[in-house]
């Protein structure tokens, strides 16, 4: 690489041109976005402008006016003797207290308005309310918590209501004026004396006025006369001051401070010339015009020196001409003002009901001062009276608040008591509602039990049973046979009745020794001791429960008295081990008693008597053997609960209903006993009719006996209580059924007569099996009990009596002693020779049939 100098100035040959630099495109300036940087939103509204103007207006015009007077007086006091200082000082304090209070009050009100406007959110509005507060009965704390006032509010109130607040404001303003004036220490001491003088209370100020009023006025007048005399000696007789009268001088007294201030200002400029008093007075009365002239003079100082003689002459001439009118107008204004004050005082006195004092005529400044002082005295007196009245009102208010607090506590206590009573009432209503529900349930269950429990009785039989008749004979017609009420009772029934304690029986039984077989039961026992002859399906003993006394009596009745052929039902097979399970512990009996009672009430249904004889003879039968007697004796103590177990558990207040139900139960038991006697009497009468026929009519007599007994006998579960309406209906139905039974009995008697005429003995459609009773053999008692859960189709279907399931319950030889057939034999051996002998034995032992049971 070679370094060759090349001439830059020469032409470039073969040199490649440099590419032009591209200029950057200037970005287009965006337009002014008024929505983002618009400052018109910050422009002051007209209301803001007005408020700013009001804020920046000068409010010290009157203060400046008094400041000028004070400065002039201070300069004068330094030159005068100390004797006159006290007089001028008092005069100045009086003028300040009388004339400057209005301006100071306005300033104080403005400041207080600003303070209240700034602090109005600290004290929100409070509304009196009566809260619904309930206090506990034993609480010592009050129901309403009183909120204490904030600390700021109390401080603010103390600062506003402080009596020295106005004077403090005056002192601050005067202190600022003195600091701006820059006078000597004597002036500061004088200001302090003025401040202390202005800070005196109103009462002390009034006392000073009353003591020194006359002395002060006399000194003022002497001072004024001396000034007039000195000025008249100095000035020539042709000056306008000679035209001034005493009234004009009095008019100028209100502006004495301004006059002295102007004199002190004009003395260095016109030391050689004397100033006319008329000019000074005109300057004071027309302060605005004089200020404008002074401003013009300050702007043109050269012209001011040349025009001084002309100005003095012209101003003196104008003021001398207008002075009487101005002084008169000033006095009129003062008189008008004092008249307004006295008029306002008079209206206030009328409004408050005080004595109205007449207007006082004032002449000059003396009357003006006296009227003001008297008005102030009256105002102070009225303020004292209003303060006393306000204190009385405050005391009365406190007393009323205390009484109100007592009343509120009483109201809270009453409210708590009312709430407690409401709670008790609600609890009582809940218990009453529950009691009503349980009562309704009991009534419903009782109604169902009554509907399922017909009573076969009439009023004549009730009266006969109550009178204690043991036997009766019913004679419907001369053709009808006599019904004998003397019937025999089986030994088994008598033995088990004797086994029951007296208090455990549902109906009180008279315990008598066992009568012989040939004695009549009606003569030994009352009518109401017999249990009803019922056709009830006994409950299946599926558990180890024991029967209640009433249920046990009904069960024994079914066991000891076999029934003849009955209407169509479902056969129920009972096994002997079900009855032997009763010997289990008593605890299981207590635990399952409710289930057993429920099964007992559900399975024992009411029989209906209106079925035909053909349907009655088609029902299958169940042969139930009698359980062992020793099992009864072993479990007698476990099966002896009180009769109250049969009743439902009653709630509070149902003792009366319990008594009524017991009375009705006793009445029903008496009716059942009467029906049993009637049934036995009818059977006995039928047996008496059938016995003369001999052995050839055994089967037919058995059939007739079964049919008549099934027609005339009606059994049902014992109801707890019956309503009067249903009782009347039941009695009417039972009377009707009794008439039907009697009609059927007559038909059977006629059939017996017809059968007796026939030579060939009729055979019974259903043969009773013969059983041989030996000492070591087993016994069998046939009892036909229809099933409680038979379907309705069994009424229409024809079932052969032979096809019925016959079950035999056998017991060991130990039960022979309790057998109703073996109870009378000493050796325990009894073997019936033929069916007739067996039937006769059954008639002697008091066998009776169970009525039909139709589900």
UniProtKB/Swiss-Prot annotation:
Localization per Swiss-Prot or TrEMBL: Cytoplasm, Cytoskeleton, Microtubule organizing center, Centrosome; Cytoplasm, Cytoskeleton, Microtubule organizing center, Centrosome, Centriole; Cytoplasm, Cytoskeleton, Spindle
GO cellular component terms given for this protein: centriole; centrosome; ciliary basal body; cytoplasm; intracellular membrane-bounded organelle; plasma membrane; spindle
Ranges in coiled-coil conformation: 325-437, 725-751
Composition bias, Basic residues: 291-311
Modified residues (Phosphoserine): 640, 644, 760, 764, 819
Biased composition (Polar residues): 312-328, 794-828
Residues the record lists as Phosphothreonine modifications: 235
Record keywords: Cell cycle, Cell division, Coiled coil, Cytoplasm, Cytoskeleton, Mitosis, Phosphoprotein
Stored Pfam families: SPICE
Keyword Ubl conjugation: no
InterPro entries: SPICE1
GO biological process, one term: mitotic spindle assembly
Domain of life: Eukaryota
Sequence segments annotated as region (Disordered): 166-200, 291-328, 790-834
Quaternary structure and partners: Interacts with CEP120.
Known role: Regulator required for centriole duplication, for proper bipolar spindle formation and chromosome congression in mitosis.
Protein name: Spindle and centriole-associated protein 1
């Amino acid at each position: 690489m070679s370094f060759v100098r090349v001439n830059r100035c020469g032409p470039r040959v073969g040199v490649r041109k440099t590419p032009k630099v591209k200029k950057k495109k200037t970005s287009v300036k965006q337009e002014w976005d008024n929505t983002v940087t618009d400052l018109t939103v910050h422009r002051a509204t007209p209301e803001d402008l007005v408020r700013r103007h009001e804020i920046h207006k000068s409010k010290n015009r009157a203060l400046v006016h008094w400041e000028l007077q004070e400065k002039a007086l201070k300069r004068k006091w330094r030159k005068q003797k100390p004797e006159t200082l006290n007089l001028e000082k008092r005069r100045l304090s009086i003028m300040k207290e009388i004339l400057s209070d209005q301006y100071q009050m306005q300033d104080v009100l403005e400041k207080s308005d600003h303070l209240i406007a700034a602090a109005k959110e600290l004290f929100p509005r409070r509304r009196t309310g009566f809260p619904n507060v309930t206090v506990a009965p034993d609480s010592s704390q009050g129901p309403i918590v009183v909120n204490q006032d904030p600390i700021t509010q109390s401080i603010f109130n103390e600062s506003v209501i402080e009596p020295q607040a106005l004077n403090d404001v005056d002192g601050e303003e005067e202190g600022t004026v003195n600091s701006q004036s820059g006078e000597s220490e004597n002036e500061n001491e004088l200001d302090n004396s003025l401040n202390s003088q202005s800070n005196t209370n109103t009462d002390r100020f009034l006392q000073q006025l009353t003591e020194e009023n006359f002395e002060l006025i006399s000194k003022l007048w002497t001072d004024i006369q001396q000034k007039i005399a000195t000025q008249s000696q100095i000035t020539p007789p042709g000056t306008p001051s000679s035209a001034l009268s005493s009234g004009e001088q009095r008019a100028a007294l209100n502006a004495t401070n301004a006059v002295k201030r102007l004199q002190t200002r004009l003395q260095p400029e016109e030391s050689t010339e004397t100033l006319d008093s008329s000019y000074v007075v005109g300057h004071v009365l027309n302060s605005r015009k004089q200020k404008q002239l002074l401003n013009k003079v300050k702007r043109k100082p050269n012209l001011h020196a040349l025009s001084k003689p002309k100005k003095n002459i012209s101003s003196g001439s104008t003021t001398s001409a207008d002075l009487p009118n101005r002084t008169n107008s000033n006095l009129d204004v003062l008189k008008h003002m004092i008249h307004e004050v006295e008029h306002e005082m008079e209206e206030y006195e009328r409004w408050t009901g005080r004595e109205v004092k007449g207007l006082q005529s004032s002449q000059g400044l003396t009357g003006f001062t006296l009227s003001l002082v008297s008005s102030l005295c009256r105002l102070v007196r009225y303020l004292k009276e209003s303060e006393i009245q306000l204190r009385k009102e405050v005391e009365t208010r406190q007393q009323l608040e205390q009484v109100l607090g007592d009343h509120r506590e009483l109201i809270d206590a009453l409210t708590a008591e009312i709430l407690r009573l409401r709670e008790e009432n609600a609890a009582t209503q809940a218990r009453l509602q529950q009691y009503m529900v349980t009562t309704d349930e009991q009534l419903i269950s009782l109604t169902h039990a009554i509907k399922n429990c017909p009573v076969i009785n009439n009023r004549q039989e009730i009266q006969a049973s109550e009178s204690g008749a043991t036997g009766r004979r019913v004679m419907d017609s001369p053709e009808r046979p006599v019904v004998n009420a003397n019937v025999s009772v089986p030994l088994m029934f008598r033995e088990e009745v004797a086994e029951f304690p007296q208090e455990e029986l549902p109906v009180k039984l008279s315990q008598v020794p066992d009568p012989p077989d040939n004695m009549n039961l009606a003569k030994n026992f009352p009518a109401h001791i017999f249990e009803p002859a019922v056709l009830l399906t006994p409950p299946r003993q599926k558990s180890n429960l024991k029967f209640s006394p009433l249920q046990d009596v009904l069960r024994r009745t079914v066991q000891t008295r076999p029934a003849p052929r009955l209407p169509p039902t479902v056969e129920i097979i009972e096994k002997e081990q079900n009855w032997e399970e009763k010997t289990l512990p008593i605890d299981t009996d207590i635990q399952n008693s409710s289930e057993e009672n429920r099964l007992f009430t559900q399975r024992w249904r009411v029989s209906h008597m209106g079925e035909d004889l053909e349907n009655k003879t088609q029902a299958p039968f169940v042969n139930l053997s009698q359980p062992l007697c020793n099992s009864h004796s072993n479990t007698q103590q476990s099966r002896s609960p009180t009769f109250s177990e049969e009743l439902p558990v009653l709630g509070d207040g149902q003792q009366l209903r319990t008594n009524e139900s017991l009375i009705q139960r006793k009445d029903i038991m008496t009716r059942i006993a009467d029906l049993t006697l009637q049934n036995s009497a009818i059977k006995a009468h039928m047996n008496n009719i059938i016995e003369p026929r001999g052995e050839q009519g055994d089967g037919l007599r058995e059939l007739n006996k079964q049919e008549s007994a099934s027609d005339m006998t009606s059994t049902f579960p014992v109801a707890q209580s019956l309503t009067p309406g249903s009782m009347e209906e039941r009695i009417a139905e039972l009377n009707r059924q009794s008439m039907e039974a009697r009609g059927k009995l007559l038909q059977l008697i006629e059939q017996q007569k017809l059968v007796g005429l026939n030579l060939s003995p009729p055979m019974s459609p259903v043969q009773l099996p013969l059983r041989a009773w030996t000492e070591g053999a087993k016994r069998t008692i046939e009892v036909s009990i229809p099933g409680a859960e038979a379907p309705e189709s069994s009424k229409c279907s024809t079932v052969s009596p032979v096809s019925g399931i016959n079950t035999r319950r056998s017991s060991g030889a130990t039960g022979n002693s309790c057998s109703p057939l073996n109870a009378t034999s000493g050796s325990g051996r009894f073997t019936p020779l033929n069916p007739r002998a067996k039937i006769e034995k059954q008639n002697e032992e008091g066998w009776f049939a169970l009525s039909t049971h139709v589900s």
